[in-house]
């Protein structure tokens, strides 16, 4: 390919940072189905805060980066990158509709000699078995004859300002040896820490899904330990610190597993494994355990309130944070909602405060109304406070000041506070 022109399809948490970075080296167009999203980006603001206004405006003004909803704007591109979500349905089965839709989009614009690279997290085989046949059907072109493909799994960590996209080492792959070299070269040209070229697309797909599945299993183990030690009256954090004194101990903390990656991706591999007659018992058990942690936390809070003589049905409870992780507006699959749901079985007096979350989106997605009170207005009102998300904004607060009296309960989900000021934690 003499002159590469890139189109990134999907401008969310993954696609936008990647497209912005590509634009510093190549002519780049960002494509998204949402006109409001495109309008906001072209006005120089990213509501996900993954790309700063300064960097986004620089890309638009100085590097010719544009965002669009129009197919004609990406027809003259020759290197298509698909970065759309891969969710699960209500039964935790892989939902490939976003990928099929993006593949149809590619099929409408791809030309002979072009390359399409998928970044979405999938089970091994999705790119070649599910996506490329759609591109072939819509375009009328033949895969690996008229057009070619690659896979380079995304490794974006929402809200992480240290491990940004340009600093993350990327796995790459291609449908032929020559295409693999081209794909690897394109990514290598924008990354500080380079790439790892996998021998096949399926290997690259598998590498990403086990990254997230491994973390899910490891956290599930820590959550199980937390349940055991809490029942025994032993502080889990103390145990972890002691065990960490050994050089090869993997230091992880218990916690809620939400978001669009770790809590979703294992289901893709679990389903595909069953097609081959393999039942992934460890991954399945990890998913069940982690999915139940919100309910567990809520019940721990109720027990502590009863123990301290706080009448649950009459008390007010404050949930600090609702996003799935700290310092990030992403509310997808947040497990704080599970805490809220279980607590609401005991009392209707629950206030939820989060300086990062969009109140309208929270209400639309979960039917939960965020309080519009300031932190100052919330002080001295509650029988229990659950610190659910470790936003920096909460670290400087006197959390006990939100309690109505000394009998109130502080539960620290994230292990952020000193033990002297809390009544319980994972």
What positions do the PLM features span?
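Structural/interface elements that position substrates and couple domains in central-metabolism enzymes
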Residues: 1-426
């Amino acid at each position: 390919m003499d002159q590469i022109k890139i189109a990134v399809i999907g401008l969310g948490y993954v696609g936008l940072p990647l497209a912005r970075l590509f634009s510093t080296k190549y002519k780049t167009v960002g494509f998204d189905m949402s006109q409001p999203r495109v309008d906001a980006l072209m006005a120089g603001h990213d509501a996900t805060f993954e790309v700063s206004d300064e960097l986004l405006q620089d890309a638009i003004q100085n590097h010719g980066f544009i965002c669009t909803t129009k197919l004609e704007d990406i027809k003259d591109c020759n290197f298509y990158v698909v970065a759309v979500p891969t969710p699960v349905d209500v039964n935790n089965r892989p939902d490939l509709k976003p990928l099929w839709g993006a593949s149809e989009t590619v099929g409408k614009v791809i030309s002979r000699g072009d390359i399409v690279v998928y970044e979405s997290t999938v089970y091994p085989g999705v790119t070649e078995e599910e996506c490329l046949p759609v591109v072939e059907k819509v375009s009328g072109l033949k895969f690996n004859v008229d057009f070619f493909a690659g896979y380079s799994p995304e490794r974006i960590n929402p809200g992480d300002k240290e491990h940004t996209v340009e600093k993350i080492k990327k796995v790459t792959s291609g449908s032929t040896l020559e295409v693999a070299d081209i794909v690897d070269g394109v990514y290598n040209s924008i990354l500080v820490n380079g790439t790892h070229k996998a021998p096949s697309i399926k290997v690259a797909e598998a590498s990403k899904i086990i990254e997230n599945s491994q973390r899910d299993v490891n956290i599930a183990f820590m959550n199980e330990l937390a349940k055991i030690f809490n029942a025994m009256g032993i502080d889990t954090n103390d145990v972890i610190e002691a065990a960490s004194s050994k050089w090869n101990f993997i230091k992880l903390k218990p916690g809620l597993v939400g978001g669009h990656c770790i809590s979703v991706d294992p289901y893709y591999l679990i389903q595909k494994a069953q097609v081959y007659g393999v039942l992934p018992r460890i991954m399945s058990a990890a998913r069940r355990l982690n999915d139940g942690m919100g309910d567990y936390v809520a019940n721990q809070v109720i027990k502590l309130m009863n123990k301290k003589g706080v009448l649950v049905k009459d008390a007010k409870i404050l949930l600090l944070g609702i996003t799935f992780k700290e310092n990030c507006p992403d509310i997808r699959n947040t497990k704080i909602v599970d805490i809220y749901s279980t607590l609401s079985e005991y009392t209707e007096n629950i206030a939820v405060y989060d300086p990062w979350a969009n109140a309208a989106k929270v209400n639309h997605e979960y039917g939960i109304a965020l309080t519009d009170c300031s932190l100052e207005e919330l002080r001295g009102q509650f029988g229990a406070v659950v610190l659910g998300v470790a936003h920096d904004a909460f670290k400087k607060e006197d959390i006990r000041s939100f309690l109505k009296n000394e009998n109130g309960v502080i539960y620290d989900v994230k292990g952020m506070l000193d033990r002297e000021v809390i009544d319980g934690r994972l």
